Amino acid sequence: MNEWLNVAPELLALLIFVSRVIDVSLGTFRTIVIFRGYKALAAFIGFFEIMIWLVAAGQVFKNLDQWYLALAYAGGFSMGNYVGMWIENRFAIGNELVRCLSFNRDVLAEKIREQGFKVISFDGDMGTDKLVELLFIVEKRRNVPALIKLIKELDASAVYSVSDVKSVYEGPEPLPRRLFFR
């Protein structure tokens, strides 16, 4: 390996950079799937992550006199974090809870249900004469942007928040799911 390194050291720097981008991206993605409860997937990803890391780190430690390899290593780490978050965002793994406060009672929940979303609604008041409806909607992350868009279209005055859900129990007979390509 040292023969071609002497001829093209910038190629080794590029390989180290790319290796770090891959292994840190995998690590970022692995960490996120751990928090979402996918233990087996995290273990599978972790195997490849550490194998790539060993190769990249080994080359840097073997050639400590070549400072640009350390720069490639650090640059790959930095870029890998960004790429890992981008990948996780594209996969949109898991569920999210959308809490929505609507001032137009008995309208928003029904219209959202008509679009195939499962909605739990509660009547409430804000301590004044103003009555409100509180909606809870647990939905796949990839469907949440469409749900938020629908809420904004149906009730521009609605207030909502979105939070991650680690696990969901749908009961012995799960309710029918919304089709993804609908």
From Swiss-Prot:
Transmembrane portions of the chain: 7-27, 41-61, 67-87
Task: Identify the GO cellular component terms for this protein.
Answer: plasma membrane
Q: How is this protein situated with respect to the membrane?
A: Multi-pass membrane protein
Instruction: Say if the entry is tagged with keyword Phosphoprotein.
Output: no
Keyword terms, alphabetized: Cell membrane, Membrane, Transmembrane, Transmembrane helix
Q: Which InterPro entries match?
A: DUF2179 (IPR019264), DUF5698 (IPR044035), UPF0316 (IPR022930)
**Stored CDD domains:** YitT_C_like_1 (cd16381)
- Which locations, inside or outside the cell, does it occupy? Cell membrane
Keyword Zinc-finger: yes or no?
no
Q: Which family does it belong to?
A: Belongs to the UPF0316 family.
**Annotated HAMAP family:** UPF0316 (MF_01515)
Listed name of the protein = UPF0316 protein Sde_0566
In the record, what lineage is assigned to the organism producing the protein? Answer: Bacteria, Pseudomonadati, Pseudomonadota, Gammaproteobacteria, Cellvibrionales
